[in-house]
Amino acid sequence: MPVLHNRISNETLKERMLAETEPRITISFYKYFSIAEPQETRDALYKAFESLNVFGRVYLAHEGINAQISVPESKVSAFRDFLYSFDPALNNVRLNIALDDDGKSFWVLRMKVRERIVADGIDDPTFNASDVGEYLKAAEVNAMLDDPDAVFIDMRNHYEYEVGHFENALEIPADTFREQLPKAVEMMQEHKDKKIIMYCTGGIRCEKASAWMKHSGFNKVWHIEGGIIEYARRAREQGLPVRFIGKNFVFDERMGERISEDIIAHCHQCGTPCDTHTNCKNDGCHLLFIQCPTCAEKFRGCCSELCSEESVLPEEEQRRRRAGRENGNKIFNKSRGRLNTKLGIPDPE
């Protein structure tokens, strides 16, 4: 029986990817549809994706599929043909092509079965996830941005909103999508008669959020088709003004796509304008934060003097210090509370 998961070290796989000469295309897609046997579907997809040398991260659940992947340029057509024919529900599913892509977004294929493709925390048997808001295309988005009766809601996390968002969009302050849903309903009560436009990176979160808002009694609900990625692509193709300001955070090695030249965030250590996310180089931390080149050199890529000092200790001493620490202090921690606690973020100058 073939091995349906990776057994090679991350370091080796990354070296192989960096040594490749063929360009790669970063693609994301999702689809809410019923999958009777997620594990069987996962195994069949894994075999096919691996045969096409696809890297990336794919989640499957009874409710559908969510994927961010990297495909060799010469295999994109074959990948599209396979995906569209794999299940009738996936025929002509929208493929979001990355805007700012060096082809180095992923170096391993990880495919997992989960309870949900988006962790929403919804436990309401009457909720109909298919009763979504209306789609908005790029020109319609721009028109809504000029409509005084419209309210744009950003359904992404605080660290995503911080580096880029639509003009005057509201942030729902929360660390996770599941926390945002009830807060969005609460915050929008005073705007119940307004037009509510929801958006996210590629569409998967705002689509479900639009259904939740309708379920919660809001009648005028829209969401941006294909999210920020599709909006920016279509606006550029059609010669429309791109009204998204800053950078679009993405969940891969790139950590962001440049949409406009505006730098709206600041280094979390010195306050200088900067929108470059990084993970603290201390293996006992890995906090996600924004760091300018000067501070990166000063702190050795770490989030604090303490982490900088710890990162150069002998490996055995580092392991001893890490022992017993909470898992919440480990890889890719993005909590706003932890960010503020560790860094004491300065006011922008």
Curated annotation (Swiss-Prot):
It holds the Pfam family Rhodanese. Residues 316-349 are annotated as: Disordered. Residues 146-240 form the Rhodanese domain. The active site is at C200. Keywords: Oxidoreductase, tRNA processing. The keyword Transport does not apply. InterPro entries: Rhodanese-like_dom, Rhodanese-like_dom_sf, Rhodanese_C, TrhO, TRHO_N. Residues 316-328 have a biased composition (Basic and acidic residues). GO terms for molecular function: oxidoreductase activity, acting on paired donors, with incorporation or reduction of molecular oxygen. Its EC number is 1.14.-.-. It catalyses: uridine(34) in tRNA + AH2 + O2 = 5-hydroxyuridine(34) in tRNA + A + H2O. The keyword Transport does not apply. One of its GO terms (biological process) is tRNA modification. It is an enzyme of class 1 (oxidoreductase). Belongs to the TrhO family. PANTHER family: TRNA URIDINE(34) HYDROXYLASE, UPF0176 PROTEIN YCEA. Catalyzes oxygen-dependent 5-hydroxyuridine (ho5U) modification at position 34 in tRNAs. HAMAP family: TrhO (MF_00469). This is tRNA uridine(34) hydroxylase. It comes from Enterobacter sp. (strain 638). The gene is trhO.
